[in-house]
């Protein structure tokens, strides 16, 4: 028996061919036909089984992919919702922080405005007080000058009328003048103490108002200190003017006293 190239030889196939050879050509053909039919049937069954297995694996793969896609979509939705919630939370925190910052800024501006208004009012009051004091001192000086002129005239008339009476009147006038001078000096010292106390209180209030400010208020502090320096300079100038006026008054009193003494000497002689 000959074997075709490319086919494997098996004892079963050899025994089958031996039986077919002994049975005759017709039986051989039938047997071969049956074997081919059986082989074809087996191939078809195997093909169907493979298709079913592949279909089952494909279905399982499709279901796994579908589950994975659904899980991925659910995870994406969950993360999107989480991101939205987180973004909403952060936006709310940012808004709250902005509102708190705005409220603190408004409160700071209001407190600063109140401090500035209070300082401005105090400065205006101090300027008004200085002006009133200057007017009062001018009136007092004019009144004192008028009184001195009247007293001088009275003394001159008294000298013309009667020598003894004039001496007595001059002594009384000198006594009154000394009392007036002491009174004026006491008033000047008292007013100086009051103004120094008010200036010290104003300086304390300014330092207290400017003590708790941040760096952004440094310019305002410097400006306020400059104004206070200018005010102190003005007060110092006013004090010097007042001292000069007091010196003029004292000089006038000394001149008047000297004139009275000279007049008394002339009368005595």
Swiss-Prot record:
Q: Name one GO cellular component term.
A: cytoplasm
Keyword set includes DNA-binding: no
Query: Where are the annotated segments for Disordered?
Result: 1-23
Which residues lie within the region annotated Nonhelical region? 1-24
Q: Where in the cell is it found?
A: Cytoplasm, Cytoskeleton
Q: Where is the signal peptide?
A: none
For the region Rod, give the residue spans.
Answer: 25-269
Where is it predominantly found? cytoplasm
Mind telling me which residue stretches traverse the membrane in this protein?
none
Q: What is this protein called?
A: SF-assemblin
């Amino acid at each position: 028996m000959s074997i075709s190239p490319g086919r494997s030889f098996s004892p079963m196939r050899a025994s089958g061919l031996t039986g077919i050879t002994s049975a005759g050509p017709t039986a051989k053909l039938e047997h071969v036909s049956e074997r081919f039919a059986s082989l074809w049937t087996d191939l078809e069954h195997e093909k169907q089984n493979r298709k079913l297995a592949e279909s089952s694996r494909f279905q399982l793969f499709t279901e796994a992919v579908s589950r994975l896609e659904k899980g991925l979509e659910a995870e994406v939705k969950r993360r999107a919702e989480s991101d939205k919630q987180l973004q909403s939370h952060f936006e709310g925190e940012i808004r709250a922080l902005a509102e708190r910052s705005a409220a603190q800024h408004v409160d700071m501006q209001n407190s600063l405005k109140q401090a500035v208004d209070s300082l401005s009012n105090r400065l205006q009051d101090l300027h008004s007080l200085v002006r009133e004091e200057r007017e009062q001192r001018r009136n007092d000086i004019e009144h004192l000058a008028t009184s001195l002129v009247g007293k001088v005239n009275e003394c001159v008339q008294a000298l013309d009328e009667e020598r003894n009476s004039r001496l007595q009147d001059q002594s009384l006038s000198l006594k009154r003048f000394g009392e007036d001078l002491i009174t004026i000096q006491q008033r000047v010292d008292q007013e100086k103490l009051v103004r120094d106390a008010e200036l010290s209180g104003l300086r304390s209030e300014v330092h207290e108002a400017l003590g708790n400010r941040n760096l952004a208020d440094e310019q305002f502090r410097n400006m306020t200190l400059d104004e206070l320096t200018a005010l102190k300079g003005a007060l110092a100038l006013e004090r010097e003017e007042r001292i000069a006026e007091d010196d003029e008054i004292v000089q006038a009193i000394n001149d008047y006293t000297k004139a009275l003494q000279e007049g008394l000497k002339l009368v005595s002689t």
